[in-house]
UniProtKB/Swiss-Prot annotation:
Belongs to the type A lantibiotic family. The modification 2,3-didehydrobutyrine is found at T55. This is Lantibiotic mutacin-1140. There is a cross-link at S60-C63 (S-(2-aminovinyl)-D-cysteine (Ser-Cys)). There is a cross-link at T49-C52 (Beta-methyllanthionine (Thr-Cys)). Keywords: Antibiotic, Antimicrobial, Bacteriocin, D-amino acid, Lantibiotic, Thioether bond. It comes from Streptococcus mutans.
Amino acid sequence: MSNTQLLEVLGTETFDVQEDLFAFDTTDTTIVASNDDPDTRFKSWSLCTPGCARTGSFNSYCC
């Protein structure tokens, strides 16, 4: 079914749809500045109990 036929089935106003309507432009590039250090953007902390798999604590995997 062509794009125009699909528009007729949906009951909308028909018009000529080009085939490249849904084509994606893959030539865009992302430039990351040299001072954009990923270590400054992402931080994580972990809090572990001293149980170390002996207490059955939910975070005893930290050992």
